[in-house]
């Protein structure tokens, strides 16, 4: 499963792709927001990959997809939804991850519509963090592959070696025991959570 240079997409699509390769009712991802009411756990359910947009791409999927040996390719441009898939498959020991550490986007955004006169705009607000089935936060850390392999220097899809942790004011990972003063300040300014 090649997730290199996949910047992510919809949460439901990531859950659907994960469900295609995991046993029924396996944990895929959990989301934790500011309040317990916003916490939610998503499980692998067949309807998630046999309905909606995923139905066409995965309609011919055989039951063997859940047991065939699987390798997932990731790199520094694998982000967000692709990290959800890679993390779920790795945590369940369903796949071996090969490549480079992923981008490290472990946050959930919500688009809030705002109307100004006749114009409607949207504000993207970070509202939660997501965690792999084992409880790992990949925010600003990324997913570590099981085996490191450098990207080829030449190819059709050059990658940028920029990760979430390289961005100014990135959301820090709360699971990091040792945080720099810069990370603590960035976290306080970005979105203060109490874990």
Q: What do these predicted ranges mean?
A:
Residues 3-195:
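C-terminal "post-core" interaction segments
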């Amino acid at each position: 499963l090649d997730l290199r240079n996949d910047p992510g997409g919809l949460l439901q699509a990531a859950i659907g792709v994960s469900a295609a390769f995991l046993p029924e009712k396996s944990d895929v991802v959990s989301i934790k927001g500011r309040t317990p009411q916003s916490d939610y756990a998503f499980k692998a359910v067949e309807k998630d990959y046999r309905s909606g947009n995923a139905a066409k791409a995965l309609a011919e999927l055989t039951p063997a997809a859940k047991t065939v040996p699987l390798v997932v390719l990731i790199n520094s441009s694998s982000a967000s939804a692709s990290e959800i898939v890679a993390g779920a498959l790795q945590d369940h020991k369903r796949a071996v991850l090969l490549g480079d550490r992923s981008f490290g986007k472990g946050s959930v955004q919500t688009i809030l519509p705002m109307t100004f006169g006749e114009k409607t705009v949207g504000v993207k607000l970070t509202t939660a963090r997501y965690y792999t089935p084992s409880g790992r936060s990949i925010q600003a850390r990324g997913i570590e592959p099981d085996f490191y392999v450098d990207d080829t220097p030449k190819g059709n899809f050059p990658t940028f070696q920029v990760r979430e942790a390289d961005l100014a004011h990135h959301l820090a990972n709360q699971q990091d025991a040792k945080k720099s003063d810069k990370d603590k300040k960035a976290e306080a300014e970005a979105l203060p959570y109490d874990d």
